[in-house]
């Protein structure tokens, strides 16, 4: 073999090696917000496995919470992905960031059937099938005795510091609940709120208050959303119900605002991950019952999101294989 052939062969080999390296590293290094609640933690872990094993990304999970994560993505361009971003509190700012090309709302419905509002336990409706609306429930405070003042109905709200605490306190005034014989139950913490539901369910007692889906408790106890009637408009919600009490002089009763929950990504992810990564996140929609079922599994097994992600990928192939290419699915199955 002459020197020209040797050089040509070397160049061809080098070319294939370089191309292969580029292909494997095409996705690059990606950071995903590992939010501080179960469903978002689970979703982040699933995204990590799929993007790493299926598409060759180098994924790092970073601790996150709704507003700090959004601020960091907007100002610093990191983390690259917020799998479950509840956008109601920052919808204007998000729309601005999207219009400027800083962020992308890749998936505007990553989980079906989610939302916030008022809920009751199924046993309550079995005994009192007429209590399907907020108006009907508020006429019967006697059925939902306050734990510290049984002469009043107990209305369970969010812990201090949560955005929904403000909304529920304003709803309390809007629906004139005090006049109707109700009193707010101060739950104190997320554990306190969850514990009040579990205690009522296990004792066969009635419970009424705020909660949201997807969550393990909604799935475990089959909780039923209360019909709160019509939505009273954006101005009432944005400029009154969601504000501190001193900024909401005349709240109007309303259904809960539609929950805007997106998968949001930075422009860096769009450029680094390419069409395959973007296509995966666009297709990645969890059916509500499946998500609630996984959250129940996590609770029953005291499992973290990483454990749940493996369980999901092993047992729910009919769901997740629709999100990825055939070649990616094959790689992911092999990795499991």
Predicted features and spans:
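A conserved helix-loop-strand patch within extracytoplasmic ligand-binding domains
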Residues: 103-157
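Short, well-ordered beta-strand elements
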Residues: 26-39, 57-62, 152-156, 281
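Ligand-binding pocket segment of bilobal, Venus flytrap-like solute-binding proteins
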Residues: 71-73, 79-86, 156-237
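An extracytoplasmic/periplasmic, membrane-proximal ligand-sensing/linker region
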Residues: 39, 165-180, 190-204, 216-218, ...
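Short, polar/charged alpha-helical segment
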Residues: 39-57, 173
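Immediate post-signal peptide segment of exported/extracytoplasmic ligand-binding proteins
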Residues: 22-32, 144-152, 321-323
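C-terminal lobe and pocket-closing loops
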Residues: 220-285
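A bilobed periplasmic-binding-protein/Venus flytrap-type ligand-binding module shared by bacterial periplasmic
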Residues: 115-126, 258-273, 294-297
